């Protein structure tokens, strides 16, 4: 457990396209002072106010996690937030050119590479953590998510698809920086060809391609020539998403998060439920 807050050594920029709109997008990561937190700002909108990376600022959870509202909304923050959280970075300003964080390769790997290229700086202020004190559970149909006390930071994510290629998969592991780098960071976002074609027809997912998505064909086979990176790559990516979504609690947590057939909306609802119950957690200093 890192005792002191961290930021990055210097600014670094990543460029690509937005997966939903298909337009050019870039993210410029800048160092920030201790106790700043993670701030997003639209650099393409004059006098745009910074938006705190916090669950209270979530604007939408359809297909991705979005922060802010209306014309200043920022979509698809989860892969970047997962990398930031896993690397133990507490303070950062993220300037976004366009309405989306670039999808890059559909994972967190490129964001980690960018941070590695500029280094991480330890700051004078102590880190704070959310320690889970009791179980908090949310349900939606046959899906559920819950926090419970645990001495560490653990994710237990289970998915269940009718598609035989995916089926029922579970990833259960304590997640620290090393685990995230090796087991989760390169797991790709995924989708079904029939859904991608439907989204394209509706003017959505215009930036989706085999370069940034794992695609399942109508015959339940992998369309990508390189196949799967892990036999359970699907649930690993869902866990990556959960790491990013739960980072919007505002502080790293000590406890276990479990989910069944979850997604961005369920993840955010679980965080909201936790933070709304003051008896369910305490803030501690490292």
From Swiss-Prot:
The active site is at residue 264. Its EC number is 3.5.1.108. GO terms for molecular function: metal ion binding; UDP-3-O-acyl-N-acetylglucosamine deacetylase activity. Gene3D superfamilies: lpxc deacetylase, domain 1, lpxc deacetylase, domain 2. Its cofactor is Zn(2+). Pathway: Glycolipid biosynthesis; lipid IV(A) biosynthesis; lipid IV(A) from (3R)-3-hydroxytetradecanoyl-[acyl-carrier-protein] and UDP-N-acetyl-alpha-D-glucosamine: step 2/6. Pfam families: LpxC. It comes from the Bacteria. Zn(2+) binds at residues 79, 237, 241. The keyword Ribosomal protein does not apply. InterPro entries: Ribosomal_Su5_D2-typ_SF, UDP-acyl_GlcNac_deAcase, UDP-acyl_GlcNac_deAcase_C, UDP-acyl_N-AcGlcN_deAcase_N. It is an enzyme of class 3 (hydrolase). One of its GO terms (cellular component) is membrane. It catalyses: a UDP-3-O-[(3R)-3-hydroxyacyl]-N-acetyl-alpha-D-glucosamine + H2O = a UDP-3-O-[(3R)-3-hydroxyacyl]-alpha-D-glucosamine + acetate. Keywords: Hydrolase, Lipid A biosynthesis, Lipid biosynthesis, Lipid metabolism, Metal-binding, Zinc. GO terms for biological process: lipid A biosynthetic process. The keyword Signal does not apply. Disulfide bonds: none annotated. Belongs to the LpxC family. Catalyzes the hydrolysis of UDP-3-O-myristoyl-N-acetylglucosamine to form UDP-3-O-myristoylglucosamine and acetate, the committed step in lipid A biosynthesis. This is UDP-3-O-acyl-N-acetylglucosamine deacetylase. It comes from Brucella melitensis biotype 2 (strain ATCC 23457).
């Amino acid at each position: 457990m890192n005792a002191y807050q961290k930021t990055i050594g210097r600014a670094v920029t990543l460029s690509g396209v937005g997966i939903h709109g298909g337009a050019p997008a870039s993210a410029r990561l800048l160092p920030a002072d201790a106790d700043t937190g993670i701030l997003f700002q639209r650099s393409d909108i004059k006098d745009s106010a910074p938006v705190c990376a916090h669950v209270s600022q979530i604007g939408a959870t359809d297909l991705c996690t979005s922060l802010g509202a209306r014309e200043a909304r920022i979509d698809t923050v989860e892969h970047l937030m997962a990398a930031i959280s896993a690397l133990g970075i507490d303070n950062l300003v993220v300037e976004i050119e366009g309405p989306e964080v670039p999808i890059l390769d559909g994972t967190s790997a490129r964001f980690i590479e960018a941070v590695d290229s500029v280094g991480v700086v330890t700051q004078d202020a102590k880190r704070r953590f959310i320690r889970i004190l009791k179980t908090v559970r949310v349900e939606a149909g046959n899906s559920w998510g819950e926090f419970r006390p645990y001495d560490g930071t653990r994710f237990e994510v289970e998915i269940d698809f009718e598609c035989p290629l995916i089926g029922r998969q579970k990833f259960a592991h304590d997640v620290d920086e090393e685990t995230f780098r090796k087991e989760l960071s390169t797991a790709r976002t995924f989708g079904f060809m029939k859904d991608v074609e439907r989204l394209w027809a509706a003017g959505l997912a215009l930036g989706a391609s085999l370069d940034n998505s794992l695609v399942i064909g109508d015959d339940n086979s992998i369309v990508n020539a390189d196949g799967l990176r892990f036999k359970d790559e699907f649930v690993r990516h869902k866990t990556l998403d959960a790491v990013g979504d739960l980072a919007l609690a505002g502080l790293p947590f000590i406890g276990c998060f479990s989910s069944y057939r979850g997604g961005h909306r369920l993840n955010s609802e679980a965080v909201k439920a936790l933070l709304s119950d003051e008896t369910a957690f305490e803030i501690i200093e490292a």
